């Protein structure tokens, strides 16, 4: 059975222990071994660091639920480029955040606020890279995701270059997407799971219009797109016919909308050919990801557990530890 296959995959990849009662996943693969669970408590450098982060996230979330998808995107943009080193937070005319793919990134204000609080409590101790990982975990948990363990002890990168940003277009093929995830040490289950982050948040119409009007340069809409959903999207995203035309935002998952809730309805929409982005819809075009999508649409807990594992794995990509990098005093600038 597919459910058993997925569950066993989650259990054995990277030496994983799952705790069904809390839907938490602990990853002890090679990259994670450089990090420590509750690092700041274990080494008695800032015992309540994670509590301080959580408190600030809870305050912010009450006023702005969109912080969950914003932080998810920010963490993805950081980890998938040069590793989880908070380089995406650095300011500068040629920094990563200035790359076209990073247009519209958000969440910086909350990270700044958390850093200020931690510098007051434990000066020069907690890295911006750890703050970003912890804050993302706490925000998506408030939105309905599991509160997975975040291993800590990361240090902050010293450079940030927009030329290194190779984040792919949301219109890439399944094979291209799979190749990209594999290059970061992630597998097919991770890809299908992490794309589920699109269960909340928004995107610009410019990333969707080709599906609506010029799929694969045919001058026609995507043939697989549900015709009623196609009509709805066309109303929100008119053809781009002139330079400087406004670029509206649309919800990645209309079912959750402004609630920005973490749900498995994203996968139900894939199975109904109602995905907003082409990269999401293409999960239906491969036998493995199609089966995973079916499992997740039918079993929310399976999705939550897999999400916990994949987020932990993503958060360990090319981390800096020990004497590498630095602990920034200001997340936007190196010391």
From Swiss-Prot:
Q: Which residues form the signal peptide?
A: 1-18
**Residues binding Ca(2+) 2:** 199, 255, 258
Q: Which CDD domains match?
A: secretory_peroxidase
Question: Could you tell me the EC number(s) of this protein?
Answer: 1.11.1.7
Instruction: Note the Pfam families from the entry.
Output: peroxidase
Q: Does the keyword Metal-binding apply?
A: yes
InterPro entries (UniProt xref): Haem_peroxidase, Haem_peroxidase_sf, Peroxidase_pln, Peroxidases_heam-ligand_BS, Secretory_peroxidase
Q: Please give the Gene Ontology molecular function terms for this protein.
A: heme binding; lactoperoxidase activity; metal ion binding
Predominantly, its location class is secreted
Disulphides: 46-122, 79-84, 128-331, 205-237
Q: Enzyme group, top EC level?
A: oxidoreductase
UniProt function note: Removal of H(2)O(2), oxidation of toxic reductants, biosynthesis and degradation of lignin, suberization, auxin catabolism, response to environmental stresses such as wounding, pathogen attack and oxidative stress. The enzyme activity has to be proved.
Miscellaneous comment as given in the Swiss-Prot or TrEMBL entry: There are 73 peroxidase genes in A.thaliana.
In Swiss-Prot or TrEMBL terms, this protein is called: Probable peroxidase 26
Gene name per UniProt:
PER26
């Amino acid at each position: 059975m597919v459910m058993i296959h997925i569950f066993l995959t989650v259990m054995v990849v990277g030496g994983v222990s799952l705790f069904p009662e809390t839907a938490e996943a602990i990853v002890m693969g090679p990259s994670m071994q450089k990090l420590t669970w509750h690092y700041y408590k274990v080494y008695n450098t800032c015992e309540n660091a994670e509590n301080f982060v959580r408190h600030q996230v809870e305050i912010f979330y009450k006023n702005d639920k969109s912080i969950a998808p914003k932080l998810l995107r920010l963490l993805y943009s950081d980890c998938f480029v040069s590793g989880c080193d908070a380089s995406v937070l650095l300011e500068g005319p040629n920094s990563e955040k200035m790359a076209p793919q990073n247009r519209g990134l958000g969440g910086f204000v909350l990270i700044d606020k958390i850093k200020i609080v931690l510098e007051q409590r434990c000066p020069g101790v907690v890295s911006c890279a750890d703050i970003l990982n912890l804050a993302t975990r706490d925000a998506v948990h408030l939105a309905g995701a599991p509160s997975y363990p975040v291993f800590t002890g990361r240090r902050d990168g010293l450079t940030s270059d927009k030329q290194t940003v190779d984040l792919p277009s949301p219109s890439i093929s399944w094979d291209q997407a799979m190749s990209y995830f594999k290059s970061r040490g992630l597998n097919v289950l991770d890809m299908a799971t992490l794309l589920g982050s699109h269960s909340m948040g928004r995107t610009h119409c410019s990333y969707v219009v080709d599906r609506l009007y010029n799929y694969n340069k045919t001058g026609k809409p995507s043939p697989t797109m549900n015709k009623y959903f196609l009509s709805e999207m066309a109303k929100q995203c008119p053809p781009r016919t002139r330079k400087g035309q406004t670029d509206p935002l649309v919800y990645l998952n209309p079912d959750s909308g402004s609630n920005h809730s973490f749900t498995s309805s994203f996968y139900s929409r894939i199975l109904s050919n109602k995905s907003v982005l082409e990269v999401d819809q293409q999960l239906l075009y491969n036998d493995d990801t199609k089966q995973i999508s079916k499992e997740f649409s039918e079993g929310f807990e399976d999705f939550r557990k897999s999400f916990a594992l994949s987020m932990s794995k993503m958060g360990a990509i090319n981390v800096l530890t020990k004497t590498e990098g630095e602990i920034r005093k200001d997340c936007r600038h190196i010391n």
